[in-house]
């Protein structure tokens, strides 16, 4: 029996990619698709909208509750405000939730995850999450004798800075080095000399760059670089669908991440 997956934010860059990935994956089927209230696409079939030549029998709705009720698991790529509504619906309908929404500071995911399974990751790419494990290992092996610089570049419409993925890399380094992440961030906006063990962030925005990340460990003799470049958003969509399948099969309440999959 196929897993029924709902998609919140179905008309966004990621939403369309996820719908197409669901169409091609034999383990799942689309249960419903949500767009923002007032969208001109409400009531239309998702088939032509995602580039399919025929209707798929699924009409776009603005009702988050409706899609949660009809789904086995739901994938959300929206905004902080919309994700909050998804969290409430997940608890109400007792359905697992996968979310890649970033910029969610202030949302206490653990409170909701105590009642339903929730998987949140700033980046759903399998490659990025493998890189995250490598960064943790490098930080352990190199110790705090190296300055750590994390650079990221995204398209010119991305709002949060640094990216959620870059912050995850920074936290991974801090945890491995057993230092406080908040106290060891180095800001390039001040004139202070960089202290030992600082974790710096550099941000670039331009064009349609999907996502480039580089974590550098630097001392006076050498530089170790670990890099990832996203070529197509399909990598995030494929990871999100894999996460939905995994979470639905797991079904134990708790807060998970893509690190639990790789």
UniProtKB/Swiss-Prot annotation:
Residues of the active site: 154, 158
Record's catalysed reaction(s): (S)-2,3,4,5-tetrahydrodipicolinate + NAD(+) + H2O = (2S,4S)-4-hydroxy-2,3,4,5-tetrahydrodipicolinate + NADH + H(+); (S)-2,3,4,5-tetrahydrodipicolinate + NADP(+) + H2O = (2S,4S)-4-hydroxy-2,3,4,5-tetrahydrodipicolinate + NADPH + H(+)
Pfam family name, one: DapB_C
Positions annotated to bind (S)-2,3,4,5-tetrahydrodipicolinate: 155, 164-165
Location in the cell: Cytoplasm
Keywords: Amino-acid biosynthesis, Cytoplasm, Diaminopimelate biosynthesis, Lysine biosynthesis, NAD, NADP, Oxidoreductase
Gene Ontology terms: biological process: diaminopimelate biosynthetic process; lysine biosynthetic process via diaminopimelate
MF (Gene Ontology): 4-hydroxy-tetrahydrodipicolinate reductase; NAD binding; NADP binding; oxidoreductase activity, acting on CH or CH2 groups, NAD or NADP as acceptor
UniProt entry tagged with the keyword Iron-sulfur: no
Sequence similarity: Belongs to the DapB family.
Protein name: 4-hydroxy-tetrahydrodipicolinate reductase
The organism of origin for this protein: Wolbachia pipientis subsp. Culex pipiens (strain wPip)
Gene from which this protein is expressed: dapB
